[in-house]
């Protein structure tokens, strides 16, 4: 009897997470993108994380395996990296956030990913973190 091989999807819709204002100093918002009860699980892992900080406070965005960026107030960052399975936003300021913070995740096949898969002669699914 052959085993069943489950493959994650190559592309996904954009999933949006709104972090309300008032995240206390040192407070953390964490989103696990592989929760079975959530529709994001069938698309995980993701390869694009965009965070739009509408607050005037500085936050730290953690993603992947120990990677992070600091994001000043009223600014945005787009992170493109394979294997994003969760992310956290930490208020690294001394005061609570005074505006919302919006995070978007998506899985998409970029030209770079397609070219790398061709050059390395490996399936795009494997390169993007699928099994």
Predicted regions located by residue number:
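Short, solvent-exposed S/T- and G/P-enriched segments that are highly enriched in secreted/extracellular
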Residues: 12-19, 23-39, 64-80
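Solvent-exposed, low-complexity, repeat-rich "mucin-like" stalks and linkers
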Residues: 31-53
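Extended, low-complexity segments enriched in Ser/Thr/Gly and acidic residues that occur primarily
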Residues: 1-21, 46, 83-90, 99-131
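Hydrophobic loop/turn residues within beta-sheet-rich immunoglobulin-like superfamily modules
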Residues: 54, 81-82, 92
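Short, surface-exposed beta-strand/strand-loop-strand elements in extracellular ectodomains
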Residues: 45-48, 52-70, 96-106
């Amino acid at each position: 009897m052959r085993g069943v091989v489950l493959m994650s999807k190559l592309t996904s819709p954009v999933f949006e997470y709104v972090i309300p204002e008032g995240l206390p100093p040192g407070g953390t918002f964490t989103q696990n993108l592989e929760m079975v009860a959530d529709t994001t699980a069938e698309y995980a892992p993701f390869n694009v994380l965009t965070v739009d900080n509408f607050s005037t406070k500085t936050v730290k965005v953690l993603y992947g395996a120990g990677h992070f960026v600091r994001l000043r107030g009223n600014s945005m960052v787009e992170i493109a990296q394979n294997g994003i399975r969760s992310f956290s936003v930490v208020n690294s300021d001394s005061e609570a956030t005074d505006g919302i913070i919006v995070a978007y995740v998506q899985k998409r096949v970029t030209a770079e990913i397609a070219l790398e898969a061709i050059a390395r002669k490996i399936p795009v699914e494997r390169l993007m973190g699928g099994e």
